[in-house]
């Protein structure tokens, strides 16, 4: 299921349902173009992505600005994001890793700048992306353009330095699981759901109804394990961060700097000038 935004509405929708949304929402020439696509698999994804980009804003891929490779972490970050997800402004973990790899292979690149404006992302895919950033053979810097929260901060923690826009928010270190119990709604509709599992598989169905005590304990342990890993990565990268940040608050730049989450507050232009000066010193 894909959670997407189109105009002023939100949907939780299947791929088949999304095809109907596209069919009813886009101009006739767009519908005809989509119907005419005869490519399959990844080729078809690329064609559809290009078409959708005419109507929607996609994440910008890596660019090289005078030796600084700019890698964008914008919108919700997902593993194996669909063309619709990407067309709606999400970021694919796979694309981030590809951009980091490309920057490391480019002799004209002297440093990597992560430009961040993301509320976070899925746990799946985050560790591989963190390792790609941490193991970069070129220095990595990070700039928070608006939000560097949750998974967004997880990924920029290993940067050599982190700067933030004066109007940005940083932090929200922790993991969350959001569950909805629709049983009451279905009962009002006259429908009652019965869930059966094989004996001993009592943790099945934990995401669809009010969890039992054992199911809740299992889910809490999963969250704690993921939260502990997040905590460990921040400590590993920025050992002087104040323990207060692990309550998952998010902070404006002055508070974020005082807590050790960022190093500088300023404009992107000033931060890039500082990076270029640092590169010049290292290459002399």
Where are these regions (language model features)?
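N-terminal organellar transit peptides
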Residues: 1-284
């Amino acid at each position: 299921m894909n959670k997407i935004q189109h105009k002023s509405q939100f949907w939780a929708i299947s791929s088949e349902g999304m095809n109907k949304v596209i069919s009813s929402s886009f101009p006739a020439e767009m519908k005809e173009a989509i119907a005419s696509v005869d490519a399959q698999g990844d080729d078809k994804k690329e064609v559809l992505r290009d078409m959708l980009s005419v109507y929607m804003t996609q994440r910008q891929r890596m660019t090289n600005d005078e030796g600084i490779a700019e890698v964008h972490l914008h919108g919700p970050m997902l593993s194996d994001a669909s063309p619709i997800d990407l067309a709606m402004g999400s970021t694919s973990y796979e694309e981030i890793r590809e951009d980091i790899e490309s920057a490391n292979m480019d002799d004209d690149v002297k440093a990597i700048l992560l430009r961040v404006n993301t509320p976070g992302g899925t746990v799946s895919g985050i560790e591989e992306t963190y390792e790609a950033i941490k193991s970069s053979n070129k220095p990595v810097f990070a700039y928070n353009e608006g939000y560097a929260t949750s998974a967004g901060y997880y990924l920029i923690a290993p940067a050599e330095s982190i700067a933030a826009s004066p109007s940005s928010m940083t932090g929200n270190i922790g993991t969350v699981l959001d569950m909805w119990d629709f049983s009451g709604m279905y009962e009002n509709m006259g429908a009652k759901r019965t869930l059966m599992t094989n004996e001993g598989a009592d943790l099945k169905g934990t995401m669809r109804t009010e969890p039992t005590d054992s199911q809740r304990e299992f889910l809490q342990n999963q969250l704690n394990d993921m939260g502990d890993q997040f905590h460990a990565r921040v400590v590993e990268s920025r050992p002087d961060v104040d323990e207060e940040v692990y309550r998952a608050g998010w902070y404006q730049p002055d508070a974020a700097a005082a807590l050790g989450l960022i190093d500088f507050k300023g404009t992107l232009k000033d931060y890039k000038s500082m990076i270029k000066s640092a590169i010049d010193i290292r290459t002399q």
